[in-house]
């Protein structure tokens, strides 16, 4: 009898369609893309890429922004808005002195839950992002597709309660808490005081059932969310089932400082800005490989705090062009064997180890074969 193929879920933080894609977003998306495509190319496991805007469109970050647009910008024609235009509005939304109550978001939440509705401004952004994904050769995980979460939030609460992992104080006018105190972690609210689920509460609507459906779950997140993702890791271990791995990425510093997109980002530090600078700089293949060499192997996970440098990005693109111009050596291993070298004891490929290996000077590497499958 043939053993079942391992099932792997790659689950990054979903970028909400409320602002321009910046360099930190790009780094994470490239990292996930390489991991997903390389793991899929192993051929010995089934891999899924969880990225659902539908799940997170009910959060205050997104639904609240939509409410702000309709209330404060209703007379502005945003049908042809650029990412920069939307980014400025998002900054204004984040700095408003009197945020609306959760009740004001309910019409938007209902529309998302019942029909998968997306505000026209976010639809506009997602179409622009699809263009970025196509330019960079990234797999589209369903940016504009309706992808309802597997569980209703109340079902999440019920399942957590069965395992004594939840403290529900809604009847007393408080939030729902994720309770991992038995694992030595503090209570973490999953909702507001009025019961509106936050980002973590929404994430569990897809991730909680995945624990029983997959053999391995890879959680990718930025460092600012580390405590929440340690909590998820502990939660999944307590539930049993899938082995869980975390990949923590630092945001990309600009001149030594990490800046949040909620405070605005300069055009030159967005994917749109990079596209304007690099679209004619080199061949599309060199740009795609070079971007991955820089944002994955060059910057790494980010522990060294290296700031973004356009000159080094261009050097990586130049190097990518030279590497792609060479024929693979007959002595190089085949691409599948090369990919397997960078899994360790896990079912997924380590994007950093694989990408760094392409730059080895004294080892035979099937670069063109690997690039065609994973990087282009």
Regions found by a protein language model. Name each.
Residues 1-376:
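NTP-dependent nucleotidyl-transfer catalytic core
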């Amino acid at each position: 009898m043939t053993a079942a193929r391992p099932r792997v879920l790659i689950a990054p933080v979903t970028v909400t369609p409320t602002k321009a894609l910046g360099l930190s977003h790009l780094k994470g998306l490239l990292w996930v893309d390489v991991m997903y495509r390389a793991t899929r190319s192993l051929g010995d496991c089934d891999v899924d890429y969880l990225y659902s805007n539908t799940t997170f469109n009910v959060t205050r970050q997104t639904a609240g922004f939509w409410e702000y647009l309709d209330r404060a910008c209703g007379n502005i024609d945003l049908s042809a808005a650029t990412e920069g235009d939307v980014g400025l509005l998002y900054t204004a939304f984040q700095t408003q002195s009197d945020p609306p109550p959760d009740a004001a978001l309910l019409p938007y939440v209902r529309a998302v839950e019942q029909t998968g509705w997306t505000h026209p401004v976010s639809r506009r952004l997602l179409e622009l992002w699809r263009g970025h994904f196509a330019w960079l050769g990234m797999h589209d995980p369903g940016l504009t597709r309706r992808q309802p979460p597997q569980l209703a939030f109340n079902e999440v609460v019920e399942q957590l309660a069965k395992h004594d992992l939840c403290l529900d104080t809604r009847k007393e006018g408080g939030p729902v808490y994720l309770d991992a105190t038995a694992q030595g972690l503090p209570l973490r609210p999953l909702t507001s005081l009025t019961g509106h689920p936050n980002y973590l509460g929404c994430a569990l609507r897809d991730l909680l059932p995945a624990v029983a459906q997959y053999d391995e779950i890879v959680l990718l997140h930025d460092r600012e969310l580390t405590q929440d993702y340690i909590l998820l890791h502990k939660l999944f271990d307590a539930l049993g089932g899938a082995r869980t791995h975390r990949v923590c990425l630092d945001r990309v510093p600009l001149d030594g400082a990490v800046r949040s997109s909620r405070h605005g980002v300069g055009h030159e530090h967005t994917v749109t800005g990079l596209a304007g600078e690099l679209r004619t700089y080199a061949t599309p293949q060199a740009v795609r490989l070079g971007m991955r060499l820089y944002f994955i192997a060059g910057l790494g996970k980010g522990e060294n705090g290296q700031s973004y440098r356009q000159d080094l990005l261009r050097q990586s693109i130049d190097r990518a062009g030279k590497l792609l111009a060479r024929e693979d050596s007959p002595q190089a291993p085949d691409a599948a064997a090369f990919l397997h070298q960078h899994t360790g004891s896990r079912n997924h490929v380590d994007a950093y180890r694989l990408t760094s290996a392409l730059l080895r000077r004294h080892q035979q590497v099937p670069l063109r074969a690997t690039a065609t499958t994973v990087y282009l």
